[in-house]
Amino acid sequence: GPQIIRLRPAPHVRSHIQSYSLKIKPEKHFINWQQDPFGNFLARVVFPEKTNEFRVETDLITEIRVFNPFDFFIEEHAQFFPFDYEASLKKELAPYLELKETGPLLNAMLQSIDQRKQTIIDFLVSLNQLLSHSLTYLVRLEPGVQSCEETLQKKSASCRDMAWLLCQLLRHLGLASRFASGYLIQLKPDVQSVDGPSGTEQDFTDLHAWTEVYLPGAGWVGLDPTSGLFAGEGHISLCSTPNPSGSAPITGSVEPCESALTHEMSITRIQEQRRVTKPYTETEWQSIDALGKKVD
């Protein structure tokens, strides 16, 4: 049957996408680019003949520039939690307000959340960090997403499990939310942090999942419950939907058979701009050092 591939950056990504390519094997296939009802790019691929190999390769060149994740405007009526969406907007957001799950553990967590009047930013920061601190992150290779009750009972979850739990919590609290999947790009910092974690020890990228909440005036704002931080320049969205099933990187059907799945991701810095933390390249530093020794 047809294979649906969701590995092209979404139209709304904040990072500048300079180029994108998708290569598929076997080369004898039909491909049609589409957009789903939520504006995400889909590649529909059909193979006219049976094959024992299905290979997908994507190449992406993007400009990563640091931005302030809190740099957005919020309409006056939505600056404090709780707030109500305007009637017309609420109708448009209906799929993102639909409650899919409930249960004693989910209800208990909702009861534990401070729902007194406070700025919406403070509320979202606290809720996002609550999940990050309450759950242990794990790499879970099983397909699908855990139910909220299962996640809260186990107190451990993959990124997609945490993202779905946050979606449901937000909806129960009256806030429209959607499930986002994409690439997470983490670059090794130029200098070590003196007052907190320094981040990754080497450049890294992988598929990731997070949550987006709709704030009047700001639009969709990303929350990453895995890290407890707001989504930044390293979050490259591929697909955002009301439910996780619509955001899977690849979906389709195959005949019963034995199969093996492998995947590999890598990141390369093509060009770097001078910055305060790295004003010179390593070669330039060596030249400066050599000149200094010569002067001495």
Task: Name every feature range the model reports, one short phrase each.
Residues 161-169:
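Short amphipathic alpha-helical face segments that pack within enzyme cores
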Residues 1-157, 172-296:
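Mixed-charge, low-complexity segments
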